[in-house]
From Swiss-Prot:
UniProt-recorded name of the protein: Uncharacterized protein AF_1993
Span of the signal peptide: 1-23
Keywords, comma-separated and alphabetical: Signal
Top-level division of the source organism's lineage: Archaea
Length: 126
């Protein structure tokens, strides 16, 4: 019984990984990416990037640079955090409602200068 439970757990993990890979491939093959926001800067303290209000659709959010990306937050029109994604720098997010993206950065070491970049692409059908 325990063996079947463990096997089922690992099977679910594999199916989840396969599902994410298929979804990524689908969007890359059938949609063009349109750059809707880009920003970069050099900082030495905590900083956050907040996008303009983005319309409904599917977006690729890429947070990079030499700083630490603490989290990517999706905020609805009224200012409530709808989703918070930690430990990721590349996020595929879709919504039928308008939203704002906020990316929180931190320096690799206290007081150390670092670079932060953000790119937001909207997927449009080919």
């Amino acid at each position: 019984m325990l063996k079947k439970l463990i096997m089922g757990f690992f099977l679910l993990i594999l199916l989840g990984i396969a599902g994410v890979a298929v979804m990524n491939y689908y969007y890359e093959a059938n949609y063009d990416k349109e750059l809707v926001a880009y920003d970069e800067g050099v900082f030495n303290d905590r900083v956050h990037f907040t996008s303009e209000l983005l319309g409904p659709g599917t977006y690729r959010i890429i947070a990079g640079g030499t700083g630490i990306v603490e989290d990517i937050e999706i905020i609805d029109r009224s200012g409530n955090v709808v989703a918070k994604h930690e430990d990721t720098t590349n996020l595929l997010y879709g919504s039928s409602n308008s939203f704002v993206v906020r990316v929180n950065y931190a320096p690799p070491n206290p007081g150390e200068e670092y670079e932060a970049t953000i790119e937001i692409y909207r997927y449009v059908e080919k």
